[in-house]
UniProtKB/Swiss-Prot annotation:
InterPro entries: ArchSynthase1/Queuine_TRR (IPR050076), TGT (IPR004803), TGT-like_sf (IPR036511), tRNA_ribo_trans-like (IPR002616). The gene is tgt. GO terms for molecular function: metal ion binding; tRNA-guanosine(34) queuine transglycosylase activity. This is Queuine tRNA-ribosyltransferase. The active site is at D89, D264.
């Protein structure tokens, strides 16, 4: 993988990630394909929304279908027929999400399979091995996602363990002679001094890119913005920066304002299945009764297949009847909406009018632009 920083405006960065499997324009949003599929979509449909890179889930793909089935096909690209690059998370967040059913030790994490209740152990080395078998273009280190809230001491202990696991991840990745990219993950909760320690340790180990982890786990937006404003300037300028698990459309804009290049989130797909559809002015709740007789498209400004061919009335009908097509059309629209935002951000950066884009983005939502700490 090669990263090229093409242009900057303030902290916002316009760049390019170059892989053997294709080029990814940044800032980029990655749809989430947890089980080797973006729910309800064919790979061709996902590509048509503008997506250039997908996220796969190491933890879930390890449990089902497992490494052996994956290797029968070649790798995850072959298994799901996605021709472009794939980033896989390490499984750390999913293990963190298991709550009381898991036990964290220095060696790794003991837990019970959410599929069949079997006792399972995962560590940094195992995560690297699974991701190697998946053929991931971007491999994430195995880390511990610090919960919120956490005391300074709890966050410090968690962050220090993540650093040791990062070192083990790097060593195993190098032992495999994996030709792909390995990203480190900055932890430290909402504490700036701990983020400093994490960044220093990770950059000393050396990675192809750096993720900011442990955010969007329940902390106030102000804390997320503060940590991003503090952390991003500490990261190497010539490496991509990835904000994990984020987020709402405004979170993408705020992340870019603070120097982030890559995002992923289940929100556009999950919300689509629940009838919450993103449009230029905000959100349409398609199951509301008022849409029953509305023959207009979902978003007149959208060029997606759904908006070009169907009315709000039809989408409302599909939702009320619980038709699979409704979830599919909604997902096509929401994914395209996210990709249109990213394309608009990239164009605004190319044309040196990113600040104007931000003002217009919030004006259309009747909201104030959130404050940004001066450079």
């Amino acid at each position: 993988m090669k990263y090229e920083l093409i242009k900057k405006q303030g902290r916002a960065r316009r760049g390019q990630l170059q892989f053997d499997r294709g080029t990814v324009e940044t800032p980029a949003f990655m749809p989430v394909g947890t089980y080797g599929t973006v729910k309800g979509m064919t790979p061709e449909e996902v590509k048509d929304t503008g997506a250039e890179i997908l996220l796969g889930n190491t933890f879930h793909l390890w449990l089902r279908p497992g490494q052996e089935i994956m290797k029968l096909h070649g790798d995850l690209h072959d298994f799901m027929n996605w021709k472009g690059p794939i980033l896989t998370d390490s499984g750390g967040f999913q293990v963190f999400s298991l709550g009381k059913t898991r036990k964290i030790t220095e060696e790794g994490v003991h837990f019970r399979s959410p599929v069949n209740g079997d006792k399972i152990f995962m560590d940094a080395e195992k995560s690297m091995q699974i991701q190697y078998d998946l053929g991931s273009d971007v491999v994430m280190i195995f880390d511990e996602c610090t919960p919120y809230p956490a005391t300074h001491d709890e966050a410090r202990i968690s962050m220090e363990r993540s650093i040791r696991w990062a070192d083990r991840s790097r060593n195993e990745f190098d032992r495999q002679e994996n030709p792909n990219a390995l990203f480190g993950i900055v932890q430290g909760g909402v504490y700036e001094d701990l983020r400093d320690v994490s960044v220093e340790a990770l950059t000393k180990i050396g990675f192809d890119g750096y993720a900011v982890g442990g955010l969007a786990v329940g902390e106030p937006k102000e804390d997320m913005h503060r940590i991003l404003e503090h952390t991003c300037p500490l990261l190497p300028e010539d490496k991509p920066r990835y904000l994990m698990g984020v987020g709402k459309p405004e979170d993408l804009v705020e992340g870019v304002r603070r120097g982030i290049d890559m995002f992923d989130c289940v929100m556009p797909t999950r919300n689509a299945r629940n009838g919450h559809l993103f449009v230029t002015g905000g959100i349409v709740k398609i199951r509301n009764a008022k849409h029953k007789v509305d023959t207009t498209p979902l978003d007149p400004e959208c060029d997606c297949y759904t908006c070009q061919n169907y009315s709000k009335s039809y989408l409302h009908h599909l939702d009320r009847c619980n038709e699979i097509l409704g979830a599919r059309l909604n997902t096509i629209h929401n994914l395209r909406y996210y990709q249109r935002i990213m394309a608009s951000i990239r164009k605004a950066l190319e044309e040196d009018r990113f600040e104007q884009f931000v003002e217009e983005f919030y004006a259309r939502r009747d909201r104030e632009v959130p404050p940004l700490k001066d450079l």
